[in-house]
Amino acid sequence: MAKKNRLNTTQRKTLRQKEDEYIENLKTKIDEYDPKITKAKFFKDLPISDPTLKGLRESSFIKLTEIQADSIPVSLQGHDVLAAAKTGSGKTLAFLVPVIEKLYREKWTEFDGLGALIISPTRELAMQIYEVLTKIGSHTSFSAGLVIGGKDVKFELERISRINILIGTPGRILQHLDQAVGLNTSNLQMLVLDEADRCLDMGFKKTLDAIVSTLSPSRQTLLFSATQSQSVADLARLSLTDYKTVGTHDVMDGSVNKEASTPETLQQFYIEVPLADKLDILFSFIKSHLKCKMIVFLSSSKQVHFVYETFRKMQPGISLMHLHGRQKQRARTETLDKFNRAQQVCLFATDVVARGIDFPAVDWVVQVDCPEDVDTYIHRVGRCARYGKKGKSLIMLTPQEQEAFLKRLNARKIEPGKLNIKQSKKKSIKPQLQSLLFKDPELKYLGQKAFISYVRSIYVQKDKQVFKFDELPTEEFAYSLGLPGAPKIKMKGMKTIEQAKERKNAPRQLAFLSKANEDGEVIEDKSKQPRTKYDKMFERKNQTILSEHYLNITKAQAQEDEDDDFISVKRKDHEINEAELPALTLPTSRRAQKKALSKKASLASKGNASKLIFDDEGEAHPVYELEDEEEFHKRGDAEVQKTEFLTKESAVMADIDNIDKQVAKEKKQEKKRKRLEAMRREMEAAMEEEISGDEEEGKTVAYLGTGNLSDDMSDGDMPDSEGHLKKKARTVDYSHGHNPSNSVDDDIIEVEEPQTLEDLESLTAKLIQG
């Protein structure tokens, strides 16, 4: 291959000057641009660089949305932005374009370190932002990185120092800020918080505060979300300086956006459904919309898992998928890819995909469980009707939830229409669920966990006017899930639940370092650490139907009149305290070690083994015990004892001798029986050979007896050698002039069966004489 033509020094200098002039001209256009006077409709109308425009054009981003036209010019001018817009309005491009342009104007390289930090509440949203960034920034030289949970931390640590644009979730970003040596945020240019209110709702407030405190105060900050809340306003006070609000009125002033936050092309409906009939209605809805692409939202991952497993076994006629936060990252990514490519599919999901995720061509969004607030409702229904396309949403409200929640929707200018259920389309699946749960204990366990998670979700809701815990029909709801009854539930306080949420989202490394002493050393509890792989195997807890949680759920209530004898004993103080054990150390000398480890030497030092027997009282005695002389004389005279002992032992020996004789006799008879059986088989084989040979030569054979050897021979008459066997059968030769073929009667010689040896000799002589 020919070498590429390299630019000389003069040419490179000229190229740099042109680039500097282009960037200065671009900055001038940005400063002169007034969005109030000039309302841009296309990306090319904005003062952005050619590489960015080329990437946008290749990705088919031509026309600006309302939020993009309002926020991008303000962000390009360097202002902090607090933005809110409808779902599906293009908020991702609204902050990615300013990020790329900021670094381009600053001539950012990989040696300058981290230039922009983008924080997303969920892994799926972070992955989507990263994919969009790689498309529109394909003609720039910036390096981008994605850091989320479920990925290899060491792999990320090795490369994070060379990244210019970092995208990730709050927990993993804070972990890298604590651990990564080469990650320097002192020169950070931009910070972007996507779905900021969701980050706060998920318990990331302390994590976000810790991240913001480590960043440069001279940075530019962008906060984006489809909804704004008071918590976002509080975060804006801490993170933003002299910020501009785009697409929303200031929440801190108490004003409310009069325009509805849902897309205009979205058709919204609701139905009033009793809690016990929700699964019946859901299954009937899926059966009647087999040609659609839909997302079904439930309140917890346990419910998603249960509904997916049961509906999958009932086969509604459409592809089913499920996605929730407890899945592995690889499974979540594969599910998202399959759902995006499919055209007719139903996805059961939690709120982990309710925000920001761009699902193409979703026809229906079904909310089986009532969302916690109107903002969550807006984000859920925003998964369809994106970018001006049509879509439909349906929410199922119980009679207890309907009135209060509809008032909250109407206050936000959202007025869904009411739908009536056709009884002909409704199908009850309660018998099928009961049959499935009866056959499969694991499904029953999933149903119990789904019941508990739903009841707890209602208990922890803040809006008690919508979620009335005391009016829940628990028995009917348990029956609708296929359960025989409502499981026991232990409720925790709200403070405990908030603390558990914070512990769940807290970085594990920080929790580990919190156990360090004054010297910074972490002393681990060795008693809780498995020593070998076998210890790990035995200490591993079962997560299926045999788990401890399952046993606690299914434990029957103890009867009050139960007998006191039936007591369940719990073992206590079973852990061995190492301080109480003696010091077991090997000797220092090699000879002593060899002697201690040698089995032969250790046995020699222990002496001879002794055999013990135990009496009825459980006391041990040697097999042979010697009596004292006094005890011996107490039983009588020595000669008398000797005579009694000999008589007793003689009787015992006589009985044993009789048994031995009987055993010997049986063995002898068995041996003789086997020998006779072998002789019979040999005689029969020999006779068959002689018969076949004589028939071939045309000779007549005379048989003695009945013709059956087993009937003719008895045990007493059986000879002992093979020589006598051949004398039992005789071959008669008629070659002396008598032709056996002349008559049939001539071939038969009738004789009486010989009884003695003399009879046999007489018969032989007669046969010889003819």
From Swiss-Prot:
Phosphoserine: modified positions: S692, S710, S714, S743
Enzyme Commission no: 3.6.4.13
Motif Q motif, chain ranges: 41-69
Binding-site residues, ATP: A85, K86, T87, G88, S89, G90, K91, T92
Gene Ontology cellular-component annotations: nucleolus; nucleus; small-subunit processome
Keywords associated with the record: ATP-binding, Helicase, Hydrolase, Nucleotide-binding, Nucleus, Phosphoprotein, Ribosome biogenesis, RNA-binding, rRNA processing
Span list, region Disordered: 705-724
Subunit architecture: Interacts with the U3 and U14 snoRNAs. Associates with pre-ribosomal complexes.
UniProt remark on domains: The Q motif is unique to and characteristic of the DEAD box family of RNA helicases and controls ATP binding and hydrolysis.
Extra remark: Present with 7900 molecules/cell in log phase SD medium.
Family, as annotated: Belongs to the DEAD box helicase family. DDX10/DBP4 subfamily.
Protein name: ATP-dependent RNA helicase HCA4
Protein species of origin: Saccharomyces cerevisiae (strain ATCC 204508 / S288c)
UniProt gene name: HCA4
